[in-house]
Amino acid sequence: MLSRRLIPCLDVRDGRVVKGVKFRDHVDMGDIVELALRYRDHGADELVFYDIGASPRGRSVDYRWVERVARLIDIPFCVAGGIGQVETARAVLHAGADKISINSPALRQPALISALAEAFGVQCVVVGIDSIREADGQWRVRCNTGDPDKTQALPLRTLDWIVEAQRLGAGEIVLNCMDSDGVRCGYDIAQLSQARALCQVPLVASGGAGNMQHFADVFHKADVDGALAASVFHSGAILIPGLKQFLREQQIEVRDV
């Protein structure tokens, strides 16, 4: 069995790391490079950087901080935000990122997934999906979630989009469960389990981590390949070395720190 991945998520706005609750009310958490170095030293398996202002503002990710991070860390990292064309993705990868993630641009232009997979290989292409449960009980996709004033509700069912994104060439899916985001009440096991049944590529859970047991639960019950978290890591409520030891005690395979 492959080792499960622990992935700190760093939401970036105006060159700083921020964190919100249910994608709103963001507060400053610190410098990008300082946090990246801390997580590298603590044994994170990978980092994900979301430039949350890029897509809502119609701009591409700021390559300068990508280059800064790439010069200083030696663990894989993925960059998301405003990557709406192949050349933008090429520039991000050239700046040092290992993978690129697309979310809102893929919803506007699904063929972008295929174009990126053809240009760089599916292993470089992550599709992020922001999902929320609506009144009828269905999970549906949200677009432009980096700015609450520009967030759009789409009729597209989350599970349908997971299937379609894979067909188009996604090499990994990150499912951001918005109802759970930032509230630390646990990952959305029900939604992630249904996604897992449809997902033939690596699936990463996002949204809801509040304690170590939540990580064990999402690996055991939803069988995800990776667990992404932000606030519990940024605040120091959970330290990665201790979390890895806890997971090993739960018979979950993780890489050494």
From Swiss-Prot:
<dbReference type="InterPro" id="IPR006062">
    <property type="entry name" value="His_biosynth"/>
</dbReference>
<dbReference type="InterPro" id="IPR050064">
    <property type="entry name" value="IGPS_HisA/HisF"/>
</dbReference>
<dbReference type="Pfam" id="PF00977">
    <property type="entry name" value="His_biosynth"/>
</dbReference>
<dbReference type="InterPro" id="IPR004651">
    <property type="entry name" value="HisF"/>
</dbReference>
<protein>
    <recommendedName>
        <fullName>Imidazole glycerol phosphate synthase subunit HisF</fullName>
        <ecNumber>4.3.2.10</ecNumber>
    </recommendedName>
</protein>
<dbReference type="GO" id="GO:0000105">
    <property type="term" value="P:L-histidine biosynthetic process"/>
</dbReference>
<feature type="active site">
    <location>
        <position position="11"/>
    </location>
</feature>
<dbReference type="GO" id="GO:0005737">
    <property type="term" value="C:cytoplasm"/>
</dbReference>
<comment type="subunit">
    <text>Heterodimer of HisH and HisF.</text>
</comment>
<dbReference type="GO" id="GO:0000107">
    <property type="term" value="F:imidazoleglycerol-phosphate synthase activity"/>
</dbReference>
<keyword id="KW-0456">Lyase</keyword>
<comment type="function">
    <text>IGPS catalyzes the conversion of PRFAR and glutamine to IGP, AICAR and glutamate. The HisF subunit catalyzes the cyclization activity that produces IGP and AICAR from PRFAR using the ammonia provided by the HisH subunit.</text>
</comment>
<keyword id="KW-0368">Histidine biosynthesis</keyword>
<dbReference type="GO" id="GO:0016829">
    <property type="term" value="F:lyase activity"/>
</dbReference>
<keyword id="KW-0963">Cytoplasm</keyword>
<comment type="pathway">
    <text>Amino-acid biosynthesis; L-histidine biosynthesis; L-histidine from 5-phospho-alpha-D-ribose 1-diphosphate: step 5/9.</text>
</comment>
<dbReference type="InterPro" id="IPR013785">
    <property type="entry name" value="Aldolase_TIM"/>
</dbReference>
<keyword id="KW-0028">Amino-acid biosynthesis</keyword>
<dbReference type="InterPro" id="IPR011060">
    <property type="entry name" value="RibuloseP-bd_barrel"/>
</dbReference>
<comment type="similarity">
    <text>Belongs to the HisA/HisF family.</text>
</comment>
<feature type="active site">
    <location>
        <position position="130"/>
    </location>
</feature>
